[in-house]
Amino acid sequence: MKSVRYLIGLFAFIACYYLLPISTRLLWQPDETRYAEISREMLASGDWIVPHLLGLRYFEKPIAGYWINSIGQWLFGANNFGVRAGVIFATLLTAALVTWFTLRLWRDKRLALLAAVIYLSLFIVYAIGTYAVLDPFIAFWLVAGMCSFWLAMQAQTWKGKSAGFLLLGITCGMGVMTKGFLALAVPVLSVLPWVATQKRWKDLFIYGWLAVISCVLTVLPWGLAIAQREPDFWHYFFWVEHIQRFAMDDAQHRAPFWYYLPVIIAGSLPWLGLLPGALYAGWKNRKHSATVYLLSWTIMPLLFFSVAKGKLPTYILSCFAPLAMLMAHYALLAAKNNPLALRINGWINIAFGVTGIIATFVVSPWGPMNTPVWQTFESYKVFCAWSIFSLWAFFGWYTLTNVEKTWSFAALCPLGLALLVGFSIPDRVMEGKHPQFFVEMTQESLQPSRYILTDSVGVAAGLAWSLQRDDIIMYRQTGELKYGLNYPDAKGRFVSGDEFANWLNQHRQEGIITLVLSVDRNEDINSLAIPPADAIDRQERLVLIQYRPK
């Protein structure tokens, strides 16, 4: 009966966090709008080999993540939930692997369920796991690889070992097809410390080639297909997207070595109080084979991405699966022996909630700021934000009422965030970061436009997805579309600022021409170097400028 209650509670938890509130949040640009539009175009064109964005070749990532996103929109439609369905599914599958692997290591159903709940309620997992990017997919394949390698090394027969290594190769291959060759580097680095400490080199060398073969066979069909269709894909993807992006001096998203320290701290909420103890207990029990394995999968990817010059918070998502397992194991031990860490965790959540309440007041219309985040007419959004932090503090307090029994309710601290964050986004943020909001406000003007030009790739993708058209033209800036725009068949998809006046004269009689420009909040749009327009509609950070036929 208790198991049934636990399962009902888990399904309710998943529904409240990962299903019900997702449609209430508009898509963010540039990431969500980009991946939404790539998948929409894949469905519309039927081309499942070469990824395109705005009708242009887009070689930033391989294909597998787009496949999953496309299936999400195919099943649930071109809406907010459909766009995010793939990442939610991948996150829930990862949690299922966490449950299964924890159960296999410790043979404790309660511990296994707790590990999954901790994983799903971690701030970084929830933030990225409900956000339409490719990182939840690669995290799933890496965690699947973690489980596969353990299965292979624990098997007692050659058939079991062979099956485990073949499965490992498939997960690595799918990882390569999702985000590239990092899906090979991370597993190798993660298993080496365990293999060294356990002296299991023999099994690795005897059976490892099976993983190599299955990985190659997994990637080969699509790899050959895209090489035939687009011979320069692999050169661009390997050299630009891997070497330049991560290792060279001009790497994208450069950050210092310690960049991930605050990410780990913030990402571990609402379980931050367990982080030091879980890592220390793991190190203290390093003679235990499973503990060393989980520690290695937590720390080695973190060190690898810290050394790389290019960094983003999403890169270390896979580290939190083994970390959640270590946290769950440590939490149960602490509840039995010394609940100090659980009390500290409760106080951290109270402090975070109270700090959020105060910060919300400071940036509200009634606070001391001259330019508040929310305007007076957005009072309900301020109250939503207060509710988010109030619930966080409340559940933090509740975990302290009988800490040995109630500590696990920390999983409900982000409940207000899950349910209300979509209703608390300030208009000033929505106007710049949510193209759907802009389209909603300007739908009647945008719909009949013969040509639409914009100076932002993220906005262009949002316009294309919302309006169901892929012919948006880039104006002044090429951004990440620079490579695709260099192809001969992309001629006419970019108009520079100097060319715009002549281009306008040539195309004006074909129909309404609309410019959508990103501007600074205090920028005078009359100072823009453009021909006089027939209509201007400013929505704070985005401006719609129209030219009608003469």
Swiss-Prot record:
<dbReference type="Pfam" id="PF02366">
    <property type="entry name" value="PMT"/>
</dbReference>
<keyword id="KW-0808">Transferase</keyword>
<dbReference type="GO" id="GO:0009245">
    <property type="term" value="P:lipid A biosynthetic process"/>
</dbReference>
<feature type="transmembrane region" description="Helical">
    <location>
        <begin position="134"/>
        <end position="154"/>
    </location>
</feature>
<comment type="similarity">
    <text>Belongs to the glycosyltransferase 83 family.</text>
</comment>
<dbReference type="GO" id="GO:0103015">
    <property type="term" value="F:4-amino-4-deoxy-L-arabinose transferase activity"/>
</dbReference>
<keyword id="KW-0997">Cell inner membrane</keyword>
<feature type="transmembrane region" description="Helical">
    <location>
        <begin position="346"/>
        <end position="366"/>
    </location>
</feature>
<keyword id="KW-0444">Lipid biosynthesis</keyword>
<keyword id="KW-0448">Lipopolysaccharide biosynthesis</keyword>
<dbReference type="GO" id="GO:0006493">
    <property type="term" value="P:protein O-linked glycosylation"/>
</dbReference>
<dbReference type="GO" id="GO:0010041">
    <property type="term" value="P:response to iron(III) ion"/>
</dbReference>
<feature type="transmembrane region" description="Helical">
    <location>
        <begin position="165"/>
        <end position="185"/>
    </location>
</feature>
<dbReference type="InterPro" id="IPR003342">
    <property type="entry name" value="Glyco_trans_39/83"/>
</dbReference>
<dbReference type="GO" id="GO:0005886">
    <property type="term" value="C:plasma membrane"/>
</dbReference>
<feature type="transmembrane region" description="Helical">
    <location>
        <begin position="382"/>
        <end position="402"/>
    </location>
</feature>
<keyword id="KW-0472">Membrane</keyword>
<keyword id="KW-0441">Lipid A biosynthesis</keyword>
<dbReference type="InterPro" id="IPR022839">
    <property type="entry name" value="ArnT_tfrase"/>
</dbReference>
<dbReference type="GO" id="GO:0000030">
    <property type="term" value="F:mannosyltransferase activity"/>
</dbReference>
<feature type="transmembrane region" description="Helical">
    <location>
        <begin position="113"/>
        <end position="133"/>
    </location>
</feature>
<protein>
    <recommendedName>
        <fullName>Undecaprenyl phosphate-alpha-4-amino-4-deoxy-L-arabinose arabinosyl transferase</fullName>
        <ecNumber>2.4.2.43</ecNumber>
    </recommendedName>
</protein>
<feature type="transmembrane region" description="Helical">
    <location>
        <begin position="81"/>
        <end position="101"/>
    </location>
</feature>
<dbReference type="GO" id="GO:0009103">
    <property type="term" value="P:lipopolysaccharide biosynthetic process"/>
</dbReference>
<keyword id="KW-0443">Lipid metabolism</keyword>
<feature type="transmembrane region" description="Helical">
    <location>
        <begin position="263"/>
        <end position="283"/>
    </location>
</feature>
<feature type="transmembrane region" description="Helical">
    <location>
        <begin position="288"/>
        <end position="308"/>
    </location>
</feature>
<keyword id="KW-0328">Glycosyltransferase</keyword>
<feature type="transmembrane region" description="Helical">
    <location>
        <begin position="7"/>
        <end position="27"/>
    </location>
</feature>
<comment type="pathway">
    <text>Lipopolysaccharide metabolism; 4-amino-4-deoxy-beta-L-arabinose-lipid A biosynthesis.</text>
</comment>
<dbReference type="InterPro" id="IPR050297">
    <property type="entry name" value="LipidA_mod_glycosyltrf_83"/>
</dbReference>
<feature type="transmembrane region" description="Helical">
    <location>
        <begin position="204"/>
        <end position="224"/>
    </location>
</feature>
<feature type="transmembrane region" description="Helical">
    <location>
        <begin position="315"/>
        <end position="335"/>
    </location>
</feature>
<comment type="function">
    <text>Catalyzes the transfer of the L-Ara4N moiety of the glycolipid undecaprenyl phosphate-alpha-L-Ara4N to lipid A. The modified arabinose is attached to lipid A and is required for resistance to polymyxin and cationic antimicrobial peptides.</text>
</comment>
<keyword id="KW-1003">Cell membrane</keyword>
<keyword id="KW-0812">Transmembrane</keyword>
<feature type="transmembrane region" description="Helical">
    <location>
        <begin position="406"/>
        <end position="426"/>
    </location>
</feature>
<keyword id="KW-1133">Transmembrane helix</keyword>
